[in-house]
Amino acid sequence: MEGMLIWEVNGIDDLEGTCFAQCSTKEKAEKAMQILEENGFENILEVRQSNLRLDQLSIKGKLIKL
């Protein structure tokens, strides 16, 4: 599959559905999460890989590269 992976810092529990950061590497996402945690967002965030890559969209389960 082509395209750059996207790593996200997302909220959990009451903040589920909120994306706080989108990063090009897992390490950068972890750094973003650390900064967020230092600013009051402890224990409510997770780092995860996006189901899409950069410049992709999904329609009815089909991935389309832009």
Question: Where are the regions a protein language model picked out?
Answer:
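Short aromatic-glycine-(Arg/Gly/Cys) micro-motifs in beta-strand/loop hairpins
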Residues: 1-19
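Functionally constrained cores in energy, signaling, and assembly domains
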Residues: 8-10, 22, 49-50, 54
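A short, charged, amphipathic alpha-helix used as a generic interaction element across diverse proteins
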Residues: 13-15, 23-45
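Short, mixed-charge low-complexity intrinsically disordered segments
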Residues: 35-66
